Amino acid sequence: MNKVLALLFLVFTSAFAAAKKPNIIYIMTDDQGYGDLACHGHPFIKTPNLDKLHSQNTRFTNYHVSPTCAPTRAALMSGKNAFEAGVTHTILERERMALGLPTVADVLRKAGYTTGIFGKWHLGEQDEYQPHSRGFDEVFIHGCGGIGQRFAGSQGDVPKNNYFHPTIRHNGKFVKTKGFCTDVFFLEALRWMKTQKDKPFFAYIPTNAPHGPFLAPEKYKALYKDHAKGDANQAFFGMITNIDDNVGLLMKKLDEWGLADNTLLIYSTDNGSSKGSRVFNAGMKGGKGSVNEGGSRVPLFMRIPGTTKAGKDLGQLARHIDIFPTLADIAGADLGELKLEGRSLAPLLKDDTTQWLDRTLFFHGGRWPKKGAPGKFGKGDLNLDNYKYKKFAVRTERWRLVGKETLYDIKTDPSEQTNVIDKHPEVAKKLLTEYEAFWKRARPLMVNEDAPLDVEKPFEANYLKQKENGGIPEWKVPSL
């Protein structure tokens, strides 16, 4: 009898603990920079819902990602520096995250979570690289690095796919959707969340917007006719306001469904701004693709009522490699022998006075040419190791070394205007030595450098096969 009672107690307490695990929603936009928010000082952009979320959140104001998108996604998923996860580019097979690396979705699923992705994956097109093979239960994605894109090698989305009414791969089957892409991704994510009552969920919503080509519904572009010149600029800002509306809808539904108080809601972006950095860049140098502050420093908002502090800014140096250990920590997941590069941010969310030691972060633009690649992608120096010292940076709390010859004191010069390398040569030497050790460690792990390009485009091929054999059904717009 006592054994039975003990077993029942164990089952009850385990179920109670599982029920208390917070849901996790991670929203990541594409090519939106730190300055592309009204709450960060932008003079005319309209982001009322994100501004509201900003006021409710703990904000990491010194959070950094990679200069371009696929490397950031690899770091988020693997908890490792992108080069050490095999990702050095956004195309040419170099966007494929190395096989054998456990993902944050794998770890959360083992911790009792159901997992879903809605939007842009961009870490490999072959089935073994796709999210359904990397820990995701629910998959609703476009192909390639952008809707309608195609490049040499395996990357190729559905032919002639468009931001409006895109064809999406849903759990292995393609469907023809109705609506603007960002609206579609959020609606499907919300439909799925609404059905997840028995398990905590991890919903990853990496939007394709505001990545180019710059397209937005007319009502959103119209908001910027008096502020931005040209259709593309108006569309860029309109895409962000459209994202804002969808974040507002998500927040509303979380409240309606009684999920808000037990949901960690995270908002961030994948790299610095593309269009926006030319308009307002929060005083930073550089944008997407740059190894200056404007290429890597992006928003990171985290909200979970009862844990995070509303309106609290945290200036500790943080990076995308910290997201994996943070989510695992909050979910109570067992990492076992898994070694991650990052640190959990969870202690800072609970107590902002927690000791946070200085650290050294490494950045590289990647994107070197490849033998056999067409056009500009195959031109230039084809020796990878000759790019070791090209377009790299090293960051600590105080310093940013950009290349071998430029050192900025970020504490006193956040806009990177004054090179102080002559005053602090010992600092530059130390950072360069650390970078060289990083490159030596990462170089053998760049496993995609010699991958052949004369391969099938599996995402496109699967679409064409389904179209020929049974057709592409229409997606049912969710009723929320």
Name these PLM-found stretches:
Residues 450-455:
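A glycine-rich phosphate-binding loop feature that marks nucleotide/adenosyl-phosphate handling sites
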Residues 9-17:
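Hydrophobic h-region of N-terminal signal peptides that target proteins for export
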Residues 2, 16-403, 412-433, 437, ...:
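Formylglycine-dependent sulfatase
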Residues 1-8:
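Sec-dependent signal peptide recognition
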